[in-house]
């Protein structure tokens, strides 16, 4: 795993860095990590509407691969935060397990189990989560990246 600028290698092959001044301020105003659905409202979703050539019958394998490559290129996507106190807030990036990463962060939003029916629908259903997630919404051809409110993005 490459170490992004400003990050340090720590135990168990993890990399970490302390929160910067703005991240610490944000963390404090949203309740010191005690986020609820109503308080986790500073996040933004990033959405693109995609089109595929007729030769691509199923875009999901391509999107999963692109999401995985994006994680390799930007390890910060997998960052979670921990703290022993409000004065010791740190982002931590653990070694990447490809299968677990895809199972826990890539979602196809279709059928009765879909969380979102469109990217617009995501605005009213902003869910708290521990890391950034990607959502493919076939009904609208939208690919949405949804960072956590405390994400280092």
UniProtKB/Swiss-Prot annotation:
This is Satratoxin biosynthesis SC2 cluster transcription factor SAT15. It is found in: Nucleus. GO terms for cellular component: nucleus. Keywords: Nucleus, Transcription, Transcription regulation. Its main location: nucleus. Gene3D superfamilies: Chloramphenicol acetyltransferase-like domain (3.30.559.10). InterPro entries: CAT-like_dom_sf. The lineage of its organism: Eukaryota, Fungi, Dikarya, Ascomycota, Pezizomycotina. Trichothecenes are sesquiterpenoid toxins that act by inhibiting protein biosynthesis. The keyword Nucleus applies. Transcriptional regulator that may regulate the expression of the satratoxin biosynthesis SC2 cluster, one of the 3 clusters involved in the biosynthesis of satratoxins, trichothecene mycotoxins that are associated with human food poisonings.
